[in-house]
């Protein structure tokens, strides 16, 4: 039987725990709209990382991105979503306001500067030049936050990020699901331990219990606190082992094999399937783009001069090694992290489920410029991948 104070404390602890659990599951929710004639998927996102804001009229779909300098790169493809033009905007920080887009006018402001871009961040879209007015409408962003409680895919690390990057492979989705499952048990254990601690502090303080009762031994309670933790650990261990073994599964006949070689301080990639006896090969070095050379829309310390282009929805094998010291090839959205050891070949298998650009970094301290070894994976359609390979080989 709980006293009123205990009931009050337990009630609030349970409320906070449930809210925390719901917030974790909320991070995996996506609301997807229909496709337009341009073939680009429309999403609705409403947190401060990305927003899809709606404007009326017209028959174009505008895709805009903010980089960390609060500038905008514009992407335009034909087609509408239910007769409504959509604008996809990436907001760099919590204090940034929402924007509404309309065509045929052009203005330049410090926080909404419009720049034409031909980046391949949005695959399969027809990039065209167009002038568009960006009008500040903070009411729109607040309204969207209240109406649609979803968040955007996060394929690169963000400032003050608390959760995982969104999964692009079955392995990463399994990691996120396992985290949520374990977090449920952690909440229950935390609530129980907090209740026991607060109850002991309240009922056994010196005023209420001046002569303490000393308990030397209790068989029942010792059995209970041995059995229950063991059962909880079993519930945690079984799915953990299943996920661990699935991460070690190697595809016997992968569609594409890529070799990643770590150097101080850059990566070299070789597409082994396209090497032949005529000394024709597909290989390149991938260096980080210096901050002074970044174009608008590119991410600081994450962009490279040559991306690793792979087809989406295809079984891939990546062979990883090093030419000098220890490195580690890691891409969080793909759920992969593999050490690059000199004189040894490690391999991982992955299956990217959606098109996009995924950022990673070397995750093993390898010297002075360890922080300047980014990894960029661009997953495109099979058709675009074939065109890219043809252009590289020829």
UniProtKB/Swiss-Prot annotation:
Q: Which positions in this protein are listed as binding Cu cation A2? A: 362, 364, 366, 370
The catalysed reaction is: 4 Fe(II)-[cytochrome c] + O2 + 8 H(+)(in) = 4 Fe(III)-[cytochrome c] + 2 H2O + 4 H(+)(out)
Q: Which UniProt keywords apply?
A: Copper, Electron transport, Magnesium, Membrane, Metal-binding, Mitochondrion, Mitochondrion inner membrane, Respiratory chain, Transit peptide, Translocase, Transmembrane, Transmembrane helix, Transport
The record's similarity note reads: Belongs to the cytochrome c oxidase subunit 2 family.
User: From which residue to which does the transit peptide run?
Assistant: 1-119
Gene this protein is translated from: COX2
Q: What is this protein called?
A: Cytochrome c oxidase subunit 2, mitochondrial
Oligomer and partners: Component of the cytochrome c oxidase (complex IV, CIV), a multisubunit enzyme composed of a catalytic core of 3 subunits and several supernumerary subunits. The complex exists as a monomer or a dimer and forms supercomplexes (SCs) in the inner mitochondrial membrane with ubiquinol-cytochrome c oxidoreductase (cytochrome b-c1 complex, complex III, CIII).
Cofactor details (free text): Binds a dinuclear copper A center per subunit.
- The residues exposed to the Mitochondrial intermembrane compartment are 120-181, 244-394
| Annotated GO CC locations | mitochondrial inner membrane
One Pfam short name: COX2_TM
Gene Ontology MF annotations = copper ion binding; cytochrome-c oxidase activity
Residue ranges, Mitochondrial matrix compartment? 199-226
Its transmembrane ranges are: 182-198, 227-243
User: Which class of enzymes does this protein belong to?
Assistant: translocase
The processes (GO biological process) annotated in the record are: ATP synthesis coupled electron transport
Annotated residues that bind Mg(2+) are located at 364
Which residues bind Cu cation A1 per the record? 327, 362, 366, 373
């Amino acid at each position: 039987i709980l006293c009123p104070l205990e009931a009050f404390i337990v009630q609030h602890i349970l409320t906070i725990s449930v809210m925390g659990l719901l917030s974790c599951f909320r991070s995996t929710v996506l609301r997807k709209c229909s496709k337009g004639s341009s073939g680009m998927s429309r999403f609705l996102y409403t947190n401060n990382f990305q927003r899809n804001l709606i404007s009326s009229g017209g028959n174009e779909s505008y895709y805009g991105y903010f980089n960390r300098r609060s500038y905008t790169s514009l992407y335009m493809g034909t087609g509408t979503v239910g007769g409504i033009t959509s604008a996809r905007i990436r907001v760099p920080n919590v204090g940034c306001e929402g924007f509404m887009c309309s065509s045929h006018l052009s203005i330049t402001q410090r926080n909404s500067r419009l720049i034409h871009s031909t980046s391949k961040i949005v695959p399969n879209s027809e990039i065209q030049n167009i002038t568009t007015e960006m009008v500040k409408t903070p009411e729109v962003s607040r309204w969207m936050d209240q109406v649609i409680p979803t968040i955007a895919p996060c394929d690169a690390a963000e400032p003050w990020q608390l959760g995982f990057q969104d999964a692009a492979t079955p392995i990463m989705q399994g990691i996120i699901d396992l985290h949520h499952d374990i977090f449920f048990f952690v909440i229950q254990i935390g609530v129980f331990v907090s209740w026991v601690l607060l109850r002991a502090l309240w009922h056994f303080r010196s005023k209420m219990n001046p002569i303490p009762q000393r308990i030397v031994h209790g068989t029942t309670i010792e059995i209970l606190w041995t059995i229950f933790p063991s059962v909880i650990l079993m519930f945690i261990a079984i799915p953990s082992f299943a996920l661990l073994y699935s991460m070690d599964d190697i595809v016997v006949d992968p569609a594409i094999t890529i070799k990643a070689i770590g150097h101080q301080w850059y990566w070299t990639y070789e597409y082994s399937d396209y090497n032949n006896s005529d000394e024709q090969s597909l290989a390149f070095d991938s260096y980080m783009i210096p901050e002074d050379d970044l174009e608008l829309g590119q991410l600081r310390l994450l962009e490279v001069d040559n991306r690793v282009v792979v087809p989406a929805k295809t079984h891939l094998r990546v062979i990883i090694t090093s030419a000098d010291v220890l490195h580690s090839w890691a891409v969080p959205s793909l759920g992969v992290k593999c050490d690059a050891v000199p004189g040894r070949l490690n391999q991982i298998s992955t299956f990217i489920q959606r098109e996009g650009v995924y950022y990673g970094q070397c995750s093993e301290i390898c010297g002075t410029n360890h922080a300047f070894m980014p990894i960029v994976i661009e997953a495109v359609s099979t058709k675009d991948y074939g065109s890219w390979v043809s252009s590289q080989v020829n």
